[in-house]
A protein has these predicted regions:
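P-loop NTP-binding/switch modules centered on Walker-like glycine-rich loops
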Residues: 15, 19-23, 27-109
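Short, flexible, glycine/charge-rich loop motifs used to bind or transfer phosphoryl groups or to couple energy/partner
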Residues: 8, 41, 57, 118, ...
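Charged, flexible cofactor/metal-binding loops and thiol motifs
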Residues: 80-195, 199-200
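ABC nucleotide-binding domain signature
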Residues: 6, 51, 68, 127-129, ...
Length: 209
């Protein structure tokens, strides 16, 4: 109910843009689906744009057109949703996708977490903020922070903040290409969309943005 009241308050001034910070936090899956459907209906009826801040990859896959991935207060990768899920170019993004359970596989091993802890925002390191936790780090990552630059040969507007993406021919930082394909697979995005749709059982079918 509180989320609905806040949405009503936000719409009272007929805004063109609404910033929704974790709009489904602490909700069960049924109420979560109803809130998401409400946001989608408002966007369609009033032509209101939404910026969703969320840690839920299912919401990202089912609700967004473009994604900005942030780490330690910085944008580390941005692309349209399909491109990002199919072709992640920053190790942090790749790590997030590795943590998604695959619905088409029977996993014998545990999901792989991102090791380590986020940096102290009061005393950030001079180089890449993800470097202490990155398994593909190199010396330059510790020394200087890379810029957010276009990914070579991307299918859409795609930028990443990673020295590996900039320096490797064609863009990319993974050596094990077979493992890379396992993560950057379009099935991952489709599975998340199906999972989001499956929880929407009371307020009608959910369409995907």
């Amino acid at each position: 109910m509180r989320q609905r009241v806040m949405i009503a308050m936000a719409l009272s001034c007929n805004p063109k843009l609404i910033l929704a910070d974790e709009p489904t936090t602490a909700l069960d899956v049924t109420i979560q689906a109803q809130i998401l459907e409400l946001l989608r209906g408002l966007a369609k009826e009033f032509r209101t744009a939404f910026i969703l801040i969320t840690h839920a990859l299912g919401i990202v896959a089912g609700m967004t057109q473009r994604v900005h991935v942030m780490y330690a207060g910085r944008i580390v990768e941005k692309a349209d949703t399909v491109e990002l899920f199919a072709n992640p170019k920053m190790p942090y993004t790749w790590g997030l996708l590795r943590s998604i359970p695959r619905l088409d596989e029977q996993r014998k091993e545990k999901l792989l977490p991102i090791e380590g802890l986020p940096p102290d925002l009061i005393s950030l390191p001079p180089g890449c903020k993800f470097e202490p936790r990155c398994q593909y780090r190199r010396d330059i990552c510790r020394e200087r922070e890379p810029e957010l630059i276009p990914v070579p040969n991307a299918k859409s507007d795609h930028e990443a903040r990673c020295w590996g993406t900039q320096n490797v021919s064609g863009g990319g930082w993974l050596v094990d290409t077979d493992y890379r394909r396992e993560v950057g697979d379009m099935r991952v995005l489709e599975e998340i969309k199906q999972e989001v749709a499956s929880i929407h059982t009371e307020s009608g079918p959910m369409t995907t943005a």
